[in-house]
């Protein structure tokens, strides 16, 4: 059975799509992945064929329609009656939906987030366009999965649909990588991810004034990097706040396990953030690093269930909660982190994907 997977990115850093493709490929599905050249064409290898559609548009508002038109043509060329379409996020859905209807083949929609509630489009005209598209297609879908329990509840309630299958974007399980005899002379507080607004970084940098004998490492790049570098300099915190830039996945894993606490301190700037389970939380947990997180539904549930760190209800609590975790130390959380790592891993999510695709196959072939 052929599965044509499409996503609006250059494929290189999309871990969810890579894991889903690998899971399906290892289960015997014939996978082909289609992305684009938005963000460059980094070299990569995969055990299944992939291609990247060339986009001429320089702005996203033009790139989205260009991609969907070219994707529509590409899918028509590659699909046959023994094909399942797998559309990732709303920005690939129109092309997939039209091909699905034209060829009478099944479509699975994987919504990694609530696209229409992303902070980047909040209050903009483009948000209205995406909402119209979402409202038109999502209620017609028979097979859908999404990345958090709260997302699934939102889609079911908003569109009156059967609750989507929840496939959390957890990392592959790793054995405890910690060497507890290695102790940082200065404690390491870690943030990994894009340096965007609403990630709480502009609150954490000043909070470092109240945290002694520690450094704040920011791993990633993004539109707010220069502003946060300037803030660090203005506060005279260059010795306590380090910008490590965008790292290769292996280097990031090596740095993550050195951390004494990992942060996921998003601000409530839209439902997509509020209902998310950020990848970095489970990445920290697999590295056996305790966490400080915003008390949003999904992250809060992890702390309540596994006791792997602290929650903040306000960014005013940052220094206090980070200091609690640092004073307790990593060994204090070892048992809880090992238990959480066994549950919050990709191996627990794979059966849900395979069950969904078995359902698609049984109903259509």
Regions found by a protein language model. Give the residues of each.
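Conserved donor-binding/catalytic core segment of Leloir-type glycosyltransferases
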Residues: 5-6, 145, 182-208, 217, ...
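Nucleotide-sugar-dependent
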Residues: 11-14, 199, 250-254, 262-282, ...
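Donor nucleotide-sugar binding/catalytic pocket of nucleotide-sugar-dependent glycosyltransferases
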Residues: 35, 131-178, 242
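Nucleotide-sugar donor phosphate/pyrophosphate-binding loop at the beta->alpha transition
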Residues: 65-69, 103-106, 115-136, 173-175, ...
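Membrane-proximal helix-turn-helix segments that form the acceptor-binding/catalytic region
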Residues: 69-76, 94, 98-102, 109, ...
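Nucleotide-activated donor-binding/catalytic signature segment of Leloir-type glycosyltransferases, i.e.
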Residues: 226-254
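Conserved acidic donor-binding segment of nucleotide-sugar-dependent glycosyltransferases
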Residues: 305-316, 323-330
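A charged, aromatic-enriched C-terminal amphipathic alpha-helix characteristic of glycosyltransferases
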Residues: 316, 327-361
């Amino acid at each position: 059975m052929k599965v044509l997977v499409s996503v609006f990115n250059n494929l290189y850093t999309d871990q969810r799509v890579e894991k889903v493709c690998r899971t399906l490929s290892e289960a015997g599905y014939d996978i082909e992945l289609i992305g684009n050249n938005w963000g460059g064409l980094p070299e990569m290898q995969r055990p299944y064929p992939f291609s990247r559609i060339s986009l001429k548009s320089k702005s996203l508002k033009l790139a989205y329609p260009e991609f969907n038109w070219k994707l529509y043509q590409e899918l028509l060329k590659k699909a046959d009656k023994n094909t399942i379409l797998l559309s990732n996020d709303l920005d690939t859905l129109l092309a997939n939906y039209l091909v699905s209807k034209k060829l009478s083949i099944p479509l699975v929609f994987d919504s990694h987030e609530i696209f229409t509630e992303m902070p980047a489009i909040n209050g903009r005209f483009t948000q209205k366009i995406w909402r119209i598209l979402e409202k038109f297609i999502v209620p017609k879908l028979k097979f859908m999965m999404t990345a958090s329990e709260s997302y699934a509840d939102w889609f079911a309630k908003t569109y009156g649909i059967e609750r989507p299958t929840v496939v959390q974007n957890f990392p592959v399980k790793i054995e405890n990588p910690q060497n507890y005899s290695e102790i940082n002379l200065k404690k390491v507080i870690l943030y990994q991810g894009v340096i965007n607004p609403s990630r709480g970084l502009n609150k954490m940098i000043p909070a470092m004034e109240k945290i002694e004998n520690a450094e704040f490492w920011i791993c990633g790049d993004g539109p707010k990097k220069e502003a946060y570098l300037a803030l660090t300099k203005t506060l005279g915190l260059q010795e306590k706040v380090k910008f490590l830039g965008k790292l290769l996945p292996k280097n990031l894993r090596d740095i993550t396990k050195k951390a004494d606490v990992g942060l996921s301190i998003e601000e409530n700037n839209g439902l997509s953030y509020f209902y998310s389970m950020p990848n970095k939380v489970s990445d920290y947990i697999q590295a056996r690093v305790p966490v400080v997180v915003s008390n949003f539904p999904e992250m809060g549930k992890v702390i309540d269930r596994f006791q792997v760190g602290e929650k903040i209800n306000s960014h005013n609590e940052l220094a206090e909660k980070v200091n609690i975790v640092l004073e307790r130390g990593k060994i204090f959380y070892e048992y809880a982190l090992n238990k959480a790592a066994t549950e919050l891993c990709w191996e627990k999510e794979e059966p849900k994907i395979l069950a969904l695709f078995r359902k698609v196959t049984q109903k259509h072939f």
